Amino acid sequence: GLERYDPETRPMVEGEDYRVMTPRELRGLRNSRGICIGTARANPGRQITRPEHLTNPERNASLARTHQALAALGVDALISIGGDGTLMTANTLNRYQDMLPEGAHRVRIIHVPKTIDNDYSGIDFTFGFFTAVDVMSKELLNLRADAIATQSYFVVEVMGRMAGWLGYGVSIAGEAHMMVGVEDVVGELVDESAGSRDGIIPVYLDLDALCDRVIQLIQTRQAKGKTY
């Protein structure tokens, strides 16, 4: 709703674009499941890729409308909650405000690093990471029990975006026998035929090489009498 704000044709509507929460609604919220305020994939700063874009009307239009909407509501502080993308948006909005003339409405911005990926630099852990490891490792242990009972193998994929923290945390706690994270895609696991894009050589996983490694693991375990 904030990105579509227009003071004349698209003002902010309570109950549709924003919600005023009372102390009663907040009571006991800390230990409840889910996200009472919902989630969003909006990114008003997606067109800002260079510093000069902050003052470009075509590039900063969405960001400007978001700032104007917050100002219209009298919001003086914003707490952003999320991962890397949310952090970038919060930072872009803060930098945009630095470009505003003196006396313009300013919103103080605080970012809370909540992501299961644990891929932030500068801090040891993000909250949400350990919860995700705990929940997913229990599922992995259930699969391990099934694998032993049925003499089977399971392949499990977890999230993690650009880092293997979550995968390794789940693998260790869930007693997996093999783990491949993004940091492990080196050497023989790299698909050399991928080529380059815009002068950048992306790193892709070679699935054939990965299959060879999985087969090697299976054969090694079978030699030890473990067919799971």
Predicted regions and their residues:
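Accessory alpha-helical/coil subdomains and C-terminal extensions
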Residues: Q68-L73, A77-G82, M88-T92, Y96-L100, ...
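Conserved beta-strand scaffold positions in the cores of enzyme catalytic domains, especially
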Residues: G34-I37, I109-H111, V155, M179
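Short acidic/His/Gly/Ser-rich catalytic and metal-binding motifs that mark active-site loops
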Residues: G45-T49, N118-Y120, L189-D191
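Glycine-rich nucleotide/cofactor/substrate-binding loop typically near the N-terminus or early
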Residues: G1-L73
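Active-site-proximal loop->helix
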Residues: E3-R10, D119-G128
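Short, ordered loop/turn segments at secondary-structure junctions
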Residues: G1-L2, R41-A42, G83-D84, V107, ...
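Short glycine/serine/threonine-rich phosphate/pyrophosphate-binding segments
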Residues: L2, G45, N60-A64, G83-T92, ...
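Glycine-rich, flexible loop/turn motifs
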Residues: E25, R33, I116, S121, ...
